[in-house]
Amino acid sequence: KPLFNYVRNATVKNLKIQGTNIDGYGLVNCYTVDYGDDGDYWGTGVPETISIENCHILSGTNIKYSGFLGGYASGLNVVRFSNCTVAQNVTIGYGMADMMPDGLTHSTGALAGDFNGYVTNCSSAATVMGQDKVGGLIGAKGQSMGPCEIVDSQFTGTVVSNGCAGGVVGSGYSSGNSPCVTIEKCTVSG
């Protein structure tokens, strides 16, 4: 199971994750919105859901779903990844045939499945597998209003999918008011 079941307005840093078969997500099962001081998650003073800094998934680890994060927040409540790595000989998504309770497939990525937020200076050399929306770093943009920006990051592993797939992000989010996914100064090889 993940190290944390639920987080809100959290910072996790300087952590190494290793496990033969982690039955779930690698770090956090669920993270949630925080409606801030005024009760409105659109206003100022809305904290980030989680910041993950200098965390690493070590070689030999197998994770059933996405690497670090499970269920996502929404809107402007973002996640930040910085200086995180997923080593070679790591398998993300070994439960790719499994369905969620509502019958939908999981979005799968070495860092996160469904994601709103910022990734800076992260890398993965993992094998990432899933049914649909599978990305080397991020499975899919999670919600229409939140940002999804990946900068100065790289993927050198393998992506296996029966549907939408990408070396950095597996799928965007289609909506008239949705900001685009931003990918800058990233490399993919493998």
Annotate each language-model stretch with its function.
Residues 2-190:
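Surface-exposed loop/turn motifs in large extracellular/passenger domains
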